[in-house]
Amino acid sequence: MPTSQAAFPTPVPEARQPARAVEAPAPPPAAPAPSGGPRGPGALRVRPRGRHSLRGRLAAVAAIAAAAVVIFVVVRSLEGSSHTKTFAPAVPRVVIPEGSTRLQIAQIATRAGLTGSYRAAAKSSPLLSPAHYGAPRGTPDLEGFLFPATYDLAPPSPAGRLVDEQLAAFKEHFGSEEVRRARALRVTPYELLTIASMVEREAQVPGDRAKIAAVIYNRLHRGMPLGIDATIYYAIEERKGITTYTKELNEAQLHMDSPYNTRTRTGLPPTPISNPGVASIEAAAHPAHVPYLYYVVAADGCGEHAFSRTLAEFEANAAAYDAAVKKNGGHPPACKSK
């Protein structure tokens, strides 16, 4: 077991990516227009932070996943004066970081020595039906429900047992209160979970979670594209069957035809893009009461975002970040303790 309101402009691509996702799409033009270049109308405005912050975060998650398995071996002495020792069966302690995808968890399960296919086990389970939470018919897997925590599994530890433990933990943390809040926010529980999965991939500091959730709801209510690049990274990882894609997105990828491309499509992606923890679920269920539509990584380099209501405010915040990067020799600004 584990130990452990809001509103949306048409996208405008800029050659540079945001941190942890697109942080500030521009308002929609009255009618579609050609992009007109990196800063032209009709595409989502993004910032260079992506290559510094988002890719770094993705690489960090991958590194954590690679190192997250710890095997504990209980050693006991045999009777008598012999120095010989015998080893009890190892019990895998499997650590699932918040925001991991099922493909990343499958890699963790393999490295923990779990038997069987985690990917197959994470497709469906008699213990939980996504449809019960409002997921559409044909939802391909249990992404979003695979609760991140630390699990101690008794041998022989099949991968399916980890999935069972994760689903049981999810039910403990996503109950009637979250369902009630989803209803109050005019979304299904599955949509709330999807929003939580994006918050998990976007927020770098705890205090930003509820505000990022508010921006998502505010854009949804206005019919604006979310413009979150983390959804595009997820689409690429799914297509390639890889755990982590960390390269900077190119123009073709920014405009790729995918239901997960929240630059070119309005609404939510079809499924969660990660498996969120309690804090992000809480943020999605209780978004901050703020009017923000935009955010960009703050210029102080401490991981917080600068939030704004207007495109002009966003551009000023983005310019401040760009200036800080330039001042630091093209590198992300270093955080100075506050």
Please state what every model-predicted region is.
Residues L44-A65:
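N-terminal export and membrane-targeting signals
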Residues M1-L44:
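N-terminal targeting leaders characterized by basic, low-complexity, disordered sequences
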Residues V95-T101, A120-S129:
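Short, glycine/charge-rich beta-strand/loop segments that flank catalytic centers
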Residues S53-G56, F87-A90, G144:
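Extracellular-facing binding/remodeling surfaces
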Residues F87-T115, R183-P189:
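Glycine-rich loop/hinge motif
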Residues V70-F87:
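C-terminal region of N-terminal signal peptides and the immediate post-cleavage residues
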Residues Q107-L127, G138:
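A short alpha->loop->secondary-structure connector
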Residues T115, S129-K338:
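Bacterial extracytoplasmic/cell-wall-associated proteins, especially those involved in peptidoglycan
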